[in-house]
């Protein structure tokens, strides 16, 4: 980056923030939808520990009357295995998951848009590929 124009430096800094956010939010989704085999650990770790995640926050913000049990389970850590499994199943079936995926795609698209004024060189192509990888990864 040394010697790069200030506009390029700013674009890359902003890109890093956006793609980093998209990566973390995708990780939130993966923790809900993935399997032990793919993750190498039990899914729903954040849910078990009561850590706020994008799918959970979206579910709380868009809770419907029939989501009472999910809202209750999202309000605390789920150390009980049965409650954890129930919470995970409810969250997997909730429309918040679709909205969360859409938001991650928006963040990755916003990151990609920051690259448009950069030179068309292999590094830019690699960063654009990173945008795709962030939204398609499963573990």
Where are these regions (language model features)?
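All-alpha prenyltransferase/terpene-synthase fold signal
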Residues: 1-139
